Design a protein with these regions (language model features):
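Membrane-proximal intracellular helices of multi-pass ion channels
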Residues: 1-323
Length: 323
């Protein structure tokens, strides 16, 4: 059983290693030497461990117990390897090695689980390749969980049932194909919205790409100050929405099955957003767009805020908590 678990874990580690190539390319282009060394080491560790596990172990279907072990191992080992750049660069100015390791592992776990907690006082000051890597960990963990969920559904009958829930009519047995299709769709979102933000006036395309990843995964919270125009905030609302809905909506939009895209769950979510927006607008008098922005932010667990939620009244806070 343990070999089957390790083989599946090896596949995830290989994906993480491949995704680390992007920040490496950014670092090479910008000549960020110190950060590059840590990123190269991280990439090699991910790929070496992944290929080793795949070479020594044969991947087979997992039962429920094995899948639980896989999830635990993935969210322990991936952040451990992913903590190398944080530890190497010591972005926290830690007083000793123990604190440096603890801070690095905490930051890495926060990224891979898309929790978004951070000890960094000014993440925008990080080297750009490091900033991209930090955002990519959210993509590894956030999208990687799709594969982990697929591991629960080990029989063909269960896989087809999951396929219907995801909006994939024929899932077959090609789990890797499904996994890459998820990456492809979210990759298109990231590229398109990065270009749109750049055309709308964002000056730094690399930081913009990092911001888009942070928004669609609902993890780290970068500064909203560079994205304060109305068109940009509308784009942020769209990003938060597509990042929070069921994958079936995104898949059907890409396959132009628009009639099937509006499922009962999506319609209910839209009604919650509309009702919440009207309620917040009535209570705060902040404007329709501002109310909509914060309702989508809270209901999608993104957590963006530019009105100062800690200072508003308790009734409005309670509504945001419910959302």
């Amino acid at each position: 059983m343990i070999k089957h678990i390790l083989a599946n874990l090896g596949f995830l580690l290989q994906i993480a290693g491949l995704l680390t190539v992007l920040p490496i390319l950014v670092g090479l282009y910008l000549n960020e030497t110190q950060t590059l060394a840590s990123l190269f080491l991280t990439c090699i560790c991910f790929l070496a461990c992944g290929f080793l596990l795949n070479a020594l172990c044969e991947r087979k279907d997992l039962d429920f117990k094995s899948s639980c072990v896989l999830i635990l191992l993935a969210f322990l080992l991936m952040p451990l390897i992913g903590a190398i750049p944080y530890f190497y660069n010591d972005s926290f100015n830690s007083p000793n090695l123990a604190d440096r390791f603890t801070n690095a592992y905490f930051e890495s776990v926060s990224g891979f689980t898309t929790t978004g907690f951070s000890f960094m006082l000014n993440s925008d000051a990080l080297p750009k390749s490091f900033l991209i890597y930090r955002s990519m960990t959210e993509l590894m963990g956030g999208v990687g969980i799709v594969f982990l969920l697929l591991a629960f559904f080990h029989s063909r009958k269960s896989l087809n049932g999951l396929g219907n829930a995801l909006g994939i009519e024929r899932i077959g047995g090609n789990l890797k194909g499904i996994f890459f299709s998820v990456f492809l769709i979210y990759g298109v979102y990231i590229v398109v919205f990065t270009i749109v933000f750049y055309l709308l006036g964002s000056q730094d395309i690399i930081k913009t790409g990092s911001f888009v990843i942070d928004t669609i995964t609902g993890g780290y919270q970068p500064s909203l100050e560079p994205y304060s125009s109305i068109p940009m905030r509308i784009c942020i609302i769209l990003l938060m929405f597509v990042g929070s809905v069921n994958f079936s909506l995104n898949l059907r939009l890409f396959t132009l099955k628009l009639k099937k895209a509006l499922s009962k769950e999506i319609l209910l979510y839209l009604l919650v957003i509309i009702f919440g927006t009207v309620l917040i607008l009535f209570l705060t008098r902040r404007g329709a767009l501002t109310s909509l922005f914060h309702v989508v932010s809270m209901s999608s667990s993104t957590g963006y805020d530019y009105i100062g939620i800690p200072a508003i009244d308790e009734t409005t806070k309670s509504i945001f908590i419910l959302l």
